């Protein structure tokens, strides 16, 4: 349920999933779903493909082969960089950062609702590639955080997904 490719942490992440669906013609079942989700989050939150992507893809194809057999892969060599909630608070939001993109995938997976209408937010690839996208908005206004001496105004956890219409017509008009 990640509706747009612009928020995928790495394009290379598609390769293992394409491999899976090439060999398994039907939808994943049971533990395969759980193992594919685990693979996605481990690869996404570990900066997995930030260097030596080809060798890591070869390792990950072996993991996918295990998942095809409904076996859980070993991830001893994959370090997930999330030790505490403070790690998220300390991370500055950037659309080029794979870690931020992973969190955006988590937000998009939850099918965000419009603050005003409660309708589904339409996410658009063309806008999600840039940090000043109409779909991104600071949850707590930067001026409010500065005025109250509250930490990192550009924190990843201070970003919300909003409809382009709400951001353009309502929020910006009041800023």
What is the meaning of each model-derived region?
Residues 134, 146-169:
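Short beta-strand-alpha-helix junction that forms the catalytic/metal-binding core
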Residues 1-22:
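Polyanionic (Asp/Glu-rich) segments that form extended negatively charged tracts
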Residues 7-14, 30, 34, 130, ...:
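Conserved structured core elements
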Residues 18, 37, 137-140, 160, ...:
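Generic hydrophobic alpha-helical scaffold/packing signal
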Residues 172-175:
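Domain-exit/linker segments immediately C-terminal to small folded modules
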Residues 31-44:
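Short secondary-structure subsegments characteristic of cysteine-rich extracellular domains
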Residues 45-136, 144:
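Intrinsically disordered, low-complexity N-proximal targeting/linker segments that flank membranes
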Residues 22-31, 111-118:
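Short helix-capping/linker segments at secondary-structure and domain boundaries
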């Amino acid at each position: 349920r990640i509706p747009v490719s612009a928020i995928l942490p790495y394009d290379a992440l598609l390769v293992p999933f394409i491999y899976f669906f090439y060999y398994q013609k039907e939808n994943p079942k049971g533990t395969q779903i759980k193992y594919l989700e685990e693979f996605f989050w481990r690869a996404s939150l570990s900066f997995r493909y930030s260097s030596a992507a080809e060798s890591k893809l070869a390792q990950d194809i072996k993991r996918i082969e295990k998942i095809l057999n409904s076996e859980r892969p070993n991830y001893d060599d994959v370090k997930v960089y999330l030790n505490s909630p403070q790690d998220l608070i300390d991370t500055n939001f950037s659309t080029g950062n794979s870690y931020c993109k992973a969190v955006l995938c988590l937000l998009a997976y939850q099918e965000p609702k419009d603050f005003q209408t409660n309708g589904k937010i339409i996410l658009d690839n063309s806008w999600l590639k840039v940090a000043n996208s109409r779909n991104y908005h600071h949850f707590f206004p930067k001026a409010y955080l500065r005025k109250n001496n509250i930490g990192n105004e550009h924190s990843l956890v201070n970003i919300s997904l909003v409809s382009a219409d709400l951001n353009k017509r309502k929020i910006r008009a009041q800023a």
